[in-house]
Amino acid sequence: MYQSPRGTEDILPEDQPYWHFVRQQAARIAALYGYQRTDTPVFEDAGLFVRSVGEGTDIVSKEMYTFEDRGGDKLTLRPEGTAPVCRAYLEHGMQTRTKPVKLYYLSSIFRYDRPQAGRYRQHHQFGFEAIGEADASLDAEIIEMAWSFYNLLGITDLSLELNSIGCRQCRPNYISALKDYYQQHAGKLCPDCNTRLDKNTLRLLDCKRAECQAVAGNAPRSADYLCPDCLAHYSRLKECLTILDLPFHENFRLVRGLDYYSRTVFEIQPMAEGAQSTIGGGGRYDGLIEQLGGEATPAMGFATGIERIILNLKRQGIVPSPLPSPAVFLAYMGETASLASFALASDLRKAGIGIYQTYAQKSIKAQLRQANSLGVDWVVILGEEELKQGCAVLRNMKEAGQANIPLDQLICEIKKQI
C-alpha cells in the first residue's frame, strides 16, 4: 500500500479548521497593514536560489529539490519564499509602484531536511515582503505585524530576539574577526562548522551542537563592528520597538540561514512549555533586488511556518471553531420521492442551505441513523404521501419533534429554525 512520501503529511478534514483559521488570520493581518497577495510558481530556475540564498548555505548545498526537465532547463522546487517574490517584483515592473511595495504569500516550501516535529520536507509558509523602504521604522512595523499575527491566533506568550549583522561595507570586517576567532578554536568544532569557516562564516554562530555553542559564547559580536549608518539604523529600530511596547532580547549570535540578509535579523519564539522553538523570523535584504538584476532597493520581510503554528496551537489547547457543515439531512421514501428529493436538495442549496442527502435506496430508519451519525439538527423527510399533499416532514433531531411543512414554505421555515 502506498504511503505519503517521507517528510510530507496529509491534511485531513479534522485538521482543516486549523488551516482555515491560520490562513484567515494571515489574510486579515495582511489587509490591516496594506499587503497584497502574490502567488509564484512552485518551481523556479535553479539559478535564482543559488544566486540569492547563497551557494555556501545548507539550503543550496544540501536541501534543494532540483531537477532537469525534458527541455533541459534546471529547475528547483521553491525552498523559500522571498527570492521568488523579488523575481516577480522585477519581472512585472512593480518598481514603478508607490513604495514600499507590500506583498504577501501563502506557499508550499520544499526542503530535503531531516523530518521532525513541526519540520517537513514539504511545508507551508505565510510570509510578507516590503520592498523599497530603508528606514528602520519599517523594520519595526514588520516585527509588530508578525507579533500581532501570533496574538490574533491566540499565541501571546512570545519572545523576540533581535540583532543587526551590518551591511556589505562593515560586515566583511566582522566576518574577518569571526574567522580569526574560530580558527583559533577549529579543533573544537564539528565537521560542518569546519567547512563553514571558509564558505559561510556567519553560520558558525548558529550551530546547535554543544561543542560549537560553547565556542560561540565568546565569539566577537556583530554590534561591535557596525558602521555608523548601520549603528544608527539599529538604534532607531530599538527606539521604534520601545515606542510600540514590543519587548526584545538582543541576541548577538542570531544570524539567520540565508546569505541575502543585511542589517536587521529577528526571530520570534513562543515561551509556553513544550512549544516549538522558533515559529517565525525575518530581516532586511537590501542587496537582493540588485543581486537579481534590478536597481539597488532596500527591502524587509518575515516568514512563518504554518505547521509549526498549528503544532503550537494544539499544544496550548487553542481549538478553532469548526468549519460550517450542513445542518439538514434530506431523507426520502419511494422511487418518485427519490427524484423529487434530488431536485429539492438542489433548490435548498441554491437558497444557501447546506444539505446532506442519501443516494441509494435505504430504509427511513437507516437514513435517520445516518443523519444522527452526521450530527445534523434537522431532517427533511419526503415520501410519496407527502408529495401528494405538497409538503415535507421537518424533524427536529434534538427534540424528536416534527411537523408537516408546505413545500413552498420549506426554505423559509428551515432558515428560521437553523
Swiss-Prot record:
Cellular compartment(s): Cytoplasm
Keywords: Aminoacyl-tRNA synthetase, ATP-binding, Cytoplasm, Ligase, Nucleotide-binding, Protein biosynthesis
Protein name per UniProt: Histidine--tRNA ligase
Enzyme Commission number(s) of this protein: 6.1.1.21
GO biological process: histidyl-tRNA aminoacylation
Family to which the UniProt record says this protein belongs: Belongs to the class-II aminoacyl-tRNA synthetase family.
Name of the top EC class for this enzyme: ligase
An annotated GO cellular component: cytoplasm
Organism expressing this protein natively: Dehalococcoides mccartyi (strain ATCC BAA-2100 / JCM 16839 / KCTC 5957 / BAV1)
Subunit field text: Homodimer.
Entry GO MF terms: ATP binding; histidine-tRNA ligase activity
Entry-linked Pfam families: HGTP_anticodon, tRNA-synt_His
Annotated coiled-coil segments of the chain: none
Gene name of the record: hisS
PANTHER family in the record: HISTIDINE--TRNA LIGASE, MITOCHONDRIAL-RELATED (PTHR43707:SF1), HISTIDYL-TRNA SYNTHETASE (PTHR43707)
Catalytic activity annotation: tRNA(His) + L-histidine + ATP = L-histidyl-tRNA(His) + AMP + diphosphate + H(+)
PROSITE patterns to which the protein is assigned, alphabetical: AA_TRNA_LIGASE_II
